């Protein structure tokens, strides 16, 4: 079973995946981008240079990583529980936040091609308000090129994530990221 964890930076995806791994030590943990050697290169490049390339180039780099990730990580582990930190939903949402004129149908078709139409079984969507995001990102003390686009940008991305997950009628657990960490974990365990 493929469970995709979605949400913008700072909502607690990695924390929840780590806690779930303690509960299900047979789970395979991965992330996009960065779940493969190629993905690490893409991730590193984009975190440092996102403002230097066109939106289309950024989309295709993420799609290339997604295709490689599918072939090297997701497909070989199909029989296992796979916990994926981000998925095509993030890719589409960030792309649409950068250019709201993009066709959601085209983006979905490109992602289906990259993923051999295997979009995932369940989605955990952690949502936060502006205050929570600002506090969490400030407490980290670090920011990459994408985070430097600002809280308003991240809220726009989150809005597109919500639209995509709702429109595509996936099996989604939407959770308020301001809840206690263990309360969130309990909801996720029941969902999976």
From Swiss-Prot:
InterPro entries xrefs:
P-loop_NTPase, Thymidylate_kin-like_dom, Thymidylate_kinase
> Which CDD domains did the record assign?
TMPK (cd01672)
Q: Which keywords are on file for this protein?
A: ATP-binding, Kinase, Nucleotide biosynthesis, Nucleotide-binding, Transferase
PANTHER family associated with the record = THYMIDYLATE KINASE (PTHR10344), UMP-CMP KINASE 2, MITOCHONDRIAL (PTHR10344:SF4)
Which GO molecular function annotation, any one, does this entry have?
A: dTMP kinase activity
Task of the protein: Phosphorylation of dTMP to form dTDP in both de novo and salvage pathways of dTTP synthesis.
Its Gene Ontology cellular component terms are: cytosol
What's the protein here called? Answer: Thymidylate kinase
Say which domain of life the source belongs to. Bacteria
**E.C. number(s) listed in UniProt:** 2.7.4.9
Q: Which family does it belong to?
A: Belongs to the thymidylate kinase family.
- HAMAP family attached to this UniProt entry: Thymidylate_kinase
């Amino acid at each position: 079973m493929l469970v995709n964890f979605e949400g913008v930076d700072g909502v607690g995806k990695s924390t929840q995946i780590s806690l779930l791994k303690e509960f299900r030590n047979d789970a395979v943990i991965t992330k996009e981008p960065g779940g493969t050697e190629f993905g690490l290169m893409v991730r590193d490049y984009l975190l440092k240079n996102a403002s230097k390339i066109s939106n289309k180039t950024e989309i295709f780099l993420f799609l290339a990583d997604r295709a490689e990730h599918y072939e090297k990580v997701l497909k070989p582990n199909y029989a296992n529980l796979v916990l994926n930190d981000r998925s095509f939903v993030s890719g589409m949402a960030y792309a649409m936040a950068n250019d709201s004129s993009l066709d959601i149908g085209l983006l979905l078709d490109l992602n289906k091609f990259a993923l051999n139409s295997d979009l995932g079984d369940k989605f955990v969507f952690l949502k936060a308000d502006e205050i929570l995001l600002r506090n969490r990102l400030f407490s980290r003390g670090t920011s990459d090129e994408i985070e430097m686009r600002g809280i308003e940008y991240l809220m726009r991305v989150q809005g597109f994530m919500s639209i995509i997950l709702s429109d595509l009628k996936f099996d989604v657990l939407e959770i308020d990221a301001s809840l206690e960490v263990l309360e969130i974990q309990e909801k996720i365990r029941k969902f999976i």
